[in-house]
Amino acid sequence: MSNQTVSELKVLTAKSATNYGFDVTDFKMFTHLNPLSIQVNIRHKNPDKKVTIDDCSILSQYIDEAIQGSSILDQPFNLEISSEGIGDFLTEEKDFQTFKGFPVEVSYQDLKKIEQQINGLLLKRTDNELHINQKGKTQRIPVEDVIQVRLATPSG
């Protein structure tokens, strides 16, 4: 991927964030991942306001639409919008819906009640199972065995 493409994506992302009252504090691209991963950290332009999960979700939709509507990127990508002020742990049903497709780290107990950890992309949480995409394969973890789920930084 060319430096020009990365620069154009940074500018487009910053403009989209500014239009909705946010500043981009960090922009990273993980081009070695398939699909490509774009990680954007934001903050409110108004320093008295905190960034919420809903803010991240809404801004993610706007930035995704802007990227899709441009001719800058012609390949699949994952977009992650976050803020330093948001907790890393997913606990509420709304969190699991909002961060579908995001990289997560899951701690759980296996059949022998030994704590294990896996990383992957969050697919969904049902009443009975947590579904994680790990290298293209769906891992299903019983909800009662899950210790914690937290947002993770994409890695290769």
Swiss-Prot record:
* Keyword set includes Cell membrane: no
Give the GO biological process terms. ribosomal small subunit assembly; translation
Give the source's domain of life in one word: Bacteria
One Pfam entry name: RimP_N
**What family, per the record?**
Belongs to the RimP family.
Question: In UniProt terms, what function does this protein have?
Answer: Required for maturation of 30S ribosomal subunits.
Q: What is this protein called?
A: Ribosome maturation factor RimP
